[in-house]
């Protein structure tokens, strides 16, 4: 794990309680419903950078899906296991997803890719392609503009790393995905760039 990634892990361990208390402000139900409509019944879904499990992991479980959440913050996972007891949670670095090929029907990554050093984004999207089944679907968000910085967030140091939306979209396409929608959305006073895409193998 790089120094920048360690800043993120330690930061979320420190702010876990405050952060999870504000998750209701980030309502992406419409986008999640679009994802839900594209997945088979009883789909197996991976929530990458699941945090405290709300609202994303909970929505997926409530939709009847078999859900695994991964995060490298132990404190976030502690809340996730309490908030969504029907999901399975694993402590794991999202840049080292060692699941078998074609393991999942769907994958979500909300507010997590933005903390991964951008030079790793290409290989990250390629790993999504590998572990998703053919025709599997991803719903992810990335930064709204090109930017990299370490700043204070909820009273703790935090690291962000973004490419431009155009660059991010191209990396997703290059990884083997067909774009279903891409758009800027403001949720909880924050703007992000959202991508829904289908895996092509």
Question: What are these model-derived regions, one by one?
Answer:
Residues 1-40, 146:
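Conserved class I S-adenosyl-L-methionine
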Residues 46, 52-96:
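Class I SAM-dependent methyltransferase SAM/SAH-binding core
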Residues 95-107:
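A short acidic, Gly/Pro-enriched loop at the edge of an enzyme's catalytic core
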Residues 106-119:
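A short SAM/SAH-binding and catalytic strip from SAM-dependent methyltransferases
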Residues 122-134:
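A short glycine-rich, Lys/Arg-flanked "PGG" loop and its adjoining helix->strand segment in the class I
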Residues 135-142:
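Conserved beta-strand signature within the Rossmann-like core of class I S-adenosyl-L-methionine
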Residues 150-166:
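Acceptor-substrate binding/catalytic loop of class I
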Residues 184-201:
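Core SAM-dependent methyltransferase catalytic element
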């Amino acid at each position: 794990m790089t120094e920048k990634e360690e800043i993120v892990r330690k930061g979320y361990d420190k702010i876990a309680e405050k952060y999870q208390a504000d998750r209701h402000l980030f309502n992406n139900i419409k986008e999640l419903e679009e994802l839900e409509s594209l997945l088979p019944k009883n789909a197996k879904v991976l929530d990458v950078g699941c945090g405290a499990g709300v609202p994303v992991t909970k929505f997926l479980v409530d939709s009847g899906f078999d859900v695994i959440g991964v995060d490298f913050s132990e404190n976030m996972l502690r809340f996730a296991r309490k908030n969504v007891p029907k999901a399975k949670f694993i402590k794991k670095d999202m840049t080292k997803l060692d699941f078998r090929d074609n393991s999942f029907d769907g994958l979500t990554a909300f507010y997590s890719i933005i903390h991964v050093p951008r030079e790793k984004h290409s290989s990250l999207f390629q790993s999504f392609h590998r572990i998703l089944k053919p025709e599997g679907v991803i719903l992810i968000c990335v930064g709204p503009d090109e930017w990299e910085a370490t700043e204070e967030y909820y009273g703790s140091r935090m690291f962000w790393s973004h490419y431009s939306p155009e660059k991010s979209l191209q990396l997703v396409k290059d990884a083997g995905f067909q774009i279903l929608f891409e758009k800027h959305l403001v949720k909880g006073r924050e703007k992000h760039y959202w991508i829904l895409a289908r895996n092509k193998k």
